[in-house]
Curated annotation (Swiss-Prot):
Location relative to the cell: Host nucleus; Host cytoplasm
SUPFAM superfamilies, alphabetized: Ns1 effector domain-like, S15/NS1 RNA-binding domain
UniProt protein name: Non-structural protein 1
Gene that specifies this protein: NS
Function: Inhibits post-transcriptional processing of cellular pre-mRNA, by binding and inhibiting two cellular proteins that are required for the 3'-end processing of cellular pre-mRNAs: the 30 kDa cleavage and polyadenylation specificity factor/CPSF4 and the poly(A)-binding protein 2/PABPN1. In turn, unprocessed 3' end pre-mRNAs accumulate in the host nucleus and are no longer exported to the cytoplasm. Cellular protein synthesis is thereby shut off very early after virus infection.
Entry keyword RNA-binding: yes
Changes after translation: Upon interferon induction, ISGylated via host HERC5; this results in the impairment of NS1 interaction with RNA targets due to its inability to form homodimers and to interact with host EIF2AK2/PKR.
Domain comment in the entry: The dsRNA-binding region is required for suppression of RNA silencing.
GO cellular component: host cell cytoplasm; host cell nucleus
Major place of residence: host cell
Gene Ontology biological process terms from the UniProt entry: symbiont-mediated suppression of host cytoplasmic pattern recognition receptor signaling pathway via inhibition of RIG-I activity; symbiont-mediated suppression of host gene expression; symbiont-mediated suppression of host mRNA processing; symbiont-mediated suppression of host PKR/eIFalpha signaling; symbiont-mediated suppression of host type I interferon-mediated signaling pathway
GO molecular function list: protein serine/threonine kinase inhibitor activity; RNA binding
């Protein structure tokens, strides 16, 4: 077994432990908690593959990190932080569109993972645009703040929002929720398009209608 593979796993285990302490002290936000959960699953899988005990690996990882920090200069740390990527907040919607109250004539609500989807089933034969405000890191959607569906007249007819009781979501969660929202709106012969910002950072690829093709699950 390659020694670098082992040491990498040990350091990752210790860093996960540190991040868990941050969450336990209620200092982490939703994206932080989401990454923590995903990395926990990854570490369990890696530990099983390598045949290594996570608790023992965490202790060794702590020793490795402590040794590195002891040798690290403050100047080197500043340079590392300066070069680290920062998340960006992108806005399709104005403050008014983001905060506007709306109601549904024929309400339908569905929970898809940690996201809540709301659709007004009374809307028919409309051209609809999906807009969203969200943060981006590494050119991918990091955290969805709110997504809303607007008619050409500016009426809100659908929405996707994070559930406060289930913090943290992945880009796949967002894609699935968008698919459900689009499928629900198209059921009533509405034409749905996705904003260029969402296409670029959340969908990666789109068809000629400006949106990602739906999977069979999303069409339901």
């Amino acid at each position: 077994m390659d020694s670098n593979t082992v040491s990498s796993f040990q350091v990752d285990c210790f860093l996960w432990h540190v991040r868990k302490q941050v969450v336990d002290q209620e200092l982490g936000d939703a994206p932080f908690l989401d990454r923590l959960r995903r990395d926990q699953k990854s570490l369990r899988g890696r530990g099983s593959t390598l045949g290594l005990n996570i608790e023992a690996a965490t202790r060794v990882g702590k020793q490795i990190v402590e040794r590195i920090l002891k040798e690290e200069s403050d100047e080197a740390l500043k340079m590392t932080m300066a070069s680290a990527p920062a998340s960006r907040y992108l806005t399709d919607m104005t403050i008014e569109e983001l905060s506007r109250d709306w109601f549904m004539l024929m309400p339908k609500q569905k929970v898809e993972g940690p996201l809540c989807i709301r659709i007004d089933q009374a809307i028919m034969d409309k051209n609809i645009m999906l807009k969203a405000n969200f943060s981006v890191i590494f050119d991918r959607l990091e955290t969805l703040i709110l997504l809303r569906a607007f008619t050409e007249e500016g009426a809100i007819v659908g929405e996707i929002s994070p559930l406060p009781s289930l913090p943290g979501h992945t880009i796949e969660d967002v894609k699935n929720a968008i698919g459900v929202l689009i499928g629900g709106l198209e059921w009533n012969d509405n034409t749905v398009r996705v904003s260029k910002t969402l296409q670029r950072f959340a969908w990666r690829s789109s068809n000629e209608n400006g949106r990602h093709p739906l999977t069979p699950k999303q069409k339901q």
